[in-house]
């Protein structure tokens, strides 16, 4: 059993992009930024507990951080893990919806 404290730390927030919006509209998929060491089971449990929806499947990917420089200084951006969470039919998750 995964602890409740761990479930609250797994999701960092929704990933908002043009591709994420298109998949949300067409495929009933939500994209989240998650901690780099999160597993698919933890992500599924966290989404089901926090948003009270049923998850069909979870796909993950890690985007490597880019090397950037500013003048003579050179640095590297952090790696980011994204989770594509596919919801079951009839399930809906709306981040923008307000009071009606």
From Swiss-Prot:
Q: What does this protein do?
A: One of the early assembly proteins it binds 23S rRNA. One of the proteins that surrounds the polypeptide exit tunnel on the outside of the ribosome. Forms the main docking site for trigger factor binding to the ribosome.
| Protein name as it appears in the record | Large ribosomal subunit protein uL23
What do we know about how this protein assembles, alone or with others?
Answer: Part of the 50S ribosomal subunit. Contacts protein L29, and trigger factor when it is bound to the ribosome.
Coiled-coil spans are none
One GO CC term on file: ribonucleoprotein complex
As for family, the record states:
Belongs to the universal ribosomal protein uL23 family.
Entries under Pfam families matching the protein: Ribosomal_L23 (PF00276)
User: Which lineage is the organism of this entry classified under, starting from the top rank?
Assistant: Bacteria, Pseudomonadati, Pseudomonadota, Gammaproteobacteria, Vibrionales
Tell me if Iron is a UniProt keyword of this record.
no
- GO MF annotation terms: rRNA binding; structural constituent of ribosome
Q: Which GO terms describe its biological process?
A: translation
Which controlled-vocabulary keywords does the entry list?
Ribonucleoprotein, Ribosomal protein, RNA-binding, rRNA-binding
Q: Does the keyword Signal apply?
A: no
- Mind telling me which SUPFAM superfamilies this protein's record contains? Ribosomal proteins S24e, L23 and L15e
């Amino acid at each position: 059993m995964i602890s409740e404290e761990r479930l609250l730390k797994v999701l960092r927030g929704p990933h908002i992009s043009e591709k994420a919006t298109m998949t949300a509209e067409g495929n009933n998929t939500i994209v989240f930024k998650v901690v780099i060491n999160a597993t698919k089971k933890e992500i599924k449990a966290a989404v089901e507990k926090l948003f009270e929806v049923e998850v069909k499947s979870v796909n993950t990917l890690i985007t490597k951080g880019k090397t950037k420089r500013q003048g003579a200084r050179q640095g590297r951006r952090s790696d980011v893990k994204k989770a594509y969470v596919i919801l079951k039919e009839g399930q809906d998750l709306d981040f923008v919806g307000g009071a009606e």
